[in-house]
From Swiss-Prot:
Chief place of localization: nucleus
Biological processes, Gene Ontology terms: cell differentiation; chromosome condensation; spermatogenesis
Location of the region described as Disordered in the Swiss-Prot/TrEMBL record: 1-33
Tissue note: Testis.
One function term, GO molecular function aspect: DNA binding
Protein name: Protamine TP16
Length: 33
C-alpha cells in the first residue's frame, strides 16, 4: 500500500506544477495589458 501511494503522488505533483506554470503565465500577460 505505501508503495502505491508514492507512485500516485509523483504523477499528481507533476500535473499540479504544470497547471500552476500555465496559470502564472496567463496572469502575467493579463497584468501587463
Amino acid at each position: 500500500m505505501p508503495r502505491r501511494r508514492r507512485s500516485s503522488s509523483r504523477p499528481v505533483r507533476r500535473r499540479r506544477r504544470a497547471r500552476v506554470s500555465r496559470r502564472r503565465r496567463r496572469r502575467g500577460r493579463r497584468r501587463r495589458r
